């Protein structure tokens, strides 16, 4: 009986592992598709005359909280001033 329980537990564990792996594989494929879609949008953006590097910077900044962004901008300005770049 103990062997039956162990065998059943192993079967369940293998099934769970397989399910996790298959979910990850599906998500990785979706991630690739989304990445391709994003590249297409950037290509459209560029063909419309927008600077994709600047847009990427804006997107990065929009992800931050206001205080984080302001702190980063202040540090950037401080460093630029120190280097005579302002």
Curated annotation (Swiss-Prot):
Pfam families: GapR_DNA-bd. It comes from Brucella canis (strain ATCC 23365 / NCTC 10854 / RM-666). Belongs to the UPF0335 family. Disulfide bonds: none annotated. The lineage of its organism: Bacteria, Pseudomonadati, Pseudomonadota, Alphaproteobacteria, Hyphomicrobiales. This is UPF0335 protein BCAN_A1790. One of its GO terms (molecular function) is DNA binding. HAMAP family: UPF0335. Transmembrane segments: none annotated. InterPro entries: GapR-like, GapR-like_DNA-bd.
């Amino acid at each position: 009986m103990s062997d039956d329980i162990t065998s059943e537990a192993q079967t369940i564990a293998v099934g769970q592992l397989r399910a996790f792996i298959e979910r990850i594989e599906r998500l990785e494929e979706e991630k690739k598709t989304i990445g391709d879609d994003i590249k297409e949008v950037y290509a459209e953006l560029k063909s419309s005359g927008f600077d994709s590097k600047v847009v990427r910077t804006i997107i990065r900044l929009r992800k931050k909280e206001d205080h984080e962004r302001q702190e980063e901008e202040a540090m950037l300005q401080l460093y630029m001033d120190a280097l005579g770049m302002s």
